[in-house]
Amino acid sequence: MANIGQFKVGTEWKKLDEVTGVTFEADSSYTIQNKEYQALLVCEGAEAPTDRNVGFILQTGEAFGYTAKSGEYLWVRAYQNVAQFNIAEGI
């Protein structure tokens, strides 16, 4: 799949491989591929104890997902339009 490129953490643009270990906050927005996403939730341990799992959603219902373990970018429309954005630490 095509590389999604950079996204914004706070006021800084970062590449996905530069944000390992970033703690996303619920009710905060992040810009991915020039689109604004809202972080719906933050929970740990869905796939591994070091994963950060964040749901992102657009007002249009479009959801975005990134799987850190496989390094693939996925456009998904998940249950209730919530996707998981997983960033594994230490990879």
Predicted features, each with a name:
Residues Q33-R52:
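Short, surface-exposed beta-strand/strand-loop-strand elements in extracellular ectodomains
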Residues M1-V9:
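A short "linker-to-beta-strand initiation" element
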Residues K8-D27:
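Surface-exposed ligand/attachment interfaces on beta-rich extracellular proteins
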Residues L40-E44, Q80-G90:
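Edge beta-strands of jelly-roll/beta-sandwich modules across compartments, strongly enriched
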Residues S28-Y30, T67-V82:
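Noncatalytic modules at the cell exterior or secretory-pathway interfaces
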Residues D51-G71:
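Intrinsically disordered, low-complexity Pro/Gly/Ser/Thr-rich segments with frequent PxxP/GP/PP motifs
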